[in-house]
């Protein structure tokens, strides 16, 4: 009887943890919308102000700039190891808005597997960040993708200057 009760408690705990993980995930918090700028889908936070399309189009504009930069660097500096790494790992289809629960304003996950950006001036909403500021942040994240080391090392800062 005690082992059966323990089993029920354990099962309830596992289910609660799974529900918590789902509620904190991209799948629950983000809605994927097609951009009018480039026709690609971008996943953005569901906000009360209904500015989803503006957010998606902002991400599309910045992603297009990143694609041009990566293409230019690949064409003109393709023999450099850091540029090869950037060209190989940058995936414009993996750009999305950051979750409000994130402690970061932007990040690249696993050197390009996912790029996430905060698109608003305040963590839980506010007005959209301007395109030039978000482009600067995106260049910062591209520099992380092309850097072997993790963090803001000398290698990273040299790559950021290069970009």
Question: Which residues are covered by each model-predicted region?
Answer:
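Walker B catalytic acidic pair
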Residues: 141
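Active-site-proximal or metal-binding-adjacent scaffold patches in catalytic folds
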Residues: 1-135, 145-163
